[in-house]
């Protein structure tokens, strides 16, 4: 992101750069070795790309989760630009999106995002990663605990584990079901981008779960639905007004 930590600090070592490129190209084949998406001359005319761009625009303009995250990014010195920081591309497998830390860019998988609700969740999820990238020096590629923490936060705060989504997945439960969902979704997200065993991914999630599950920034609470997200956005705006008057 503009002014993001990777642009303010010294760049990664050569070995880490190679690992970044390898991970990005495995999941996002349109990423070049330099970390930039390929742009064909007629790419903007493909139907899937047009739909992706329109859904993204609607999400950025109307979704309360995303509007709060955009304000929080700007407040932290990492203002988001639609054309610079989002890219609609075809992706491998069933991946819906990802945050490419090497370019501070969110990749939206136009071949796997098929409706507006899905776009809303993916953009929210990836913006949480971008927010973490902005506010802290996250070692995405060599520290599995850092990745696990951000995945726990994204699963917890993006609405991915909402009751509606879990019913749609035919997952039912009562006691601590939200926590179980967050653990499961975080583990799956790690496995989607790392060639490691499920046991290693689960262990990383377990090690960071308590502290990262209880880190609700910038929402200040778990936004279980859009109403909660609107309240959180209102409180975030009021918090800014309060501190500006001190």
UniProtKB/Swiss-Prot annotation:
Protein name: Mitochondrial inner membrane protease ATP23 homolog
PANTHER family with a match to the protein in the record: MITOCHONDRIAL INNER MEMBRANE PROTEASE, MITOCHONDRIAL INNER MEMBRANE PROTEASE ATP23 HOMOLOG
Signal sequence extent: none
Pfam families assigned: Peptidase_M76
Subunit record text: Interacts with XRCC6.
Keywords: Hydrolase, Metal-binding, Metalloprotease, Protease
Family: Belongs to the peptidase M76 family.
GO biological process entries: double-strand break repair via nonhomologous end joining; mitochondrial protein processing; mitochondrial proton-transporting ATP synthase complex assembly
Entry annotated with the keyword Protease: yes
Gene Ontology CC terms: cell junction; cytosol; DNA-dependent protein kinase-DNA ligase 4 complex; intracellular membrane-bounded organelle; mitochondrion; plasma membrane
Enzyme class: hydrolase
A GO molecular-function descriptor: metalloendopeptidase activity
